Swiss-Prot record:
One GO-annotated biological process of the protein: purine ribonucleoside salvage
Family to which the UniProt record says this protein belongs: Belongs to the purine/pyrimidine phosphoribosyltransferase family.
Reaction equation(s) it catalyzes: IMP + diphosphate = hypoxanthine + 5-phospho-alpha-D-ribose 1-diphosphate; GMP + diphosphate = guanine + 5-phospho-alpha-D-ribose 1-diphosphate
The gene coding this protein: HPRT1
Molecular function terms from GO: guanine binding; guanine phosphoribosyltransferase activity; hypoxanthine phosphoribosyltransferase activity; identical protein binding; magnesium ion binding; nucleotide binding; purine nucleobase binding
Subunit details: Homotetramer.
Origin: domain of life: Eukaryota
Binding site for Mg(2+): 194
Binding site for GMP: 69, 134-142, 166, 186-188, 194
Name listed for the protein in its UniProt record: Hypoxanthine-guanine phosphoribosyltransferase
Pathway: Purine metabolism; IMP biosynthesis via salvage pathway; IMP from hypoxanthine: step 1/1
Length: 218
């Protein structure tokens, strides 16, 4: 049975933090309920994930595959930490990067209809050790679809790192290999997670308000 690394579990009763305690862009002042995961905590957790990935995949040339658009901030910061470990450790990982773009959301619901709307030729992943970097696992359908797609190209190994995993009754039971935080079934934005393309410019992970949902509804 596959083993998965531990993560920080945020309980259903977590209240988050008052917006006034952090620097929030004024144009989002009425669109958020609270700060859920402060930026500093995201960075500290990402640093530790980099170490776990090095331990689990070290010694192999890795193709790091970023799932756009939401994964780009986590991807960039995670790779920065891996590069720092490469510079300062006896065990280093040769790494190249690639990108794929998927779409499965309209407003705050995962549609279940997964579209690959970007990315290079996936045949380049044949025989490679692949690290998929994702922002959030919601139902798990998107990732299971992507993994099935990649399997057609016969990669040597595939591991998945996701910053967030959502606890939801809609889950198909999929669990990534590396997880930053497990969060309740709330729609979160910020740190490149979007709501119809908005809120990507927010440093912290926050819970969107009903006002925000209505304002930016597709």
């Amino acid at each position: 049975m596959a083993t998965h690394s531990p993560c920080i579990v945020i309980g259903d009763d977590e209240q988050g933090y008052d917006l006034d305690l952090f620097c929030i862009p004024k144009h989002y002042a009425d669109d958020l309920e609270k700060v859920y995961i402060p930026h500093g905590l995201i960075m500290d957790r990402t640093e530790r994930l980099a170490r776990e990935i090095m331990k689990g995949m070290g010694g192999h040339h890795i193709v790091a595959l970023c799932v756009l658009k939401g994964g780009y901030k986590f991807f960039a910061d995670l790779l920065d930490y891996i590069k720092a470990l490469n510079r300062n450790s006896d065990k280093s990982i040769p790494m190249t990067v690639d990108f794929i773009r998927l779409k499965s959301y309209c407003n705050d619901q995962s549609t279940g209809d997964i579209k690959v709307i970007g990315g290079d030729d996936l045949s380049t992943l044949t025989g490679k050790n692949v690290l998929i970097v994702e922002d959030i696992i919601d139902t798990g359908k998107t990732m299971k679809t992507l993994l099935s797609l990649l399997k057609q190209y016969n990669p040597k190994m595939v591991k998945v790192a996701s910053l967030l995993v959502k606890r939801t009754p809609r889950s198909v039971g999929y669990r990534p290999d590396f997880v930053g935080f497990e969060v309740p079934d709330k729609f979160v934005v910020g740190y490149a997670l979007d709501y119809n393309e908005y809120f990507r410019d927010l440093n912290h992970i926050c819970v969107i308000s009903e006002t925000g949902k209505q304002k930016y509804k597709a």
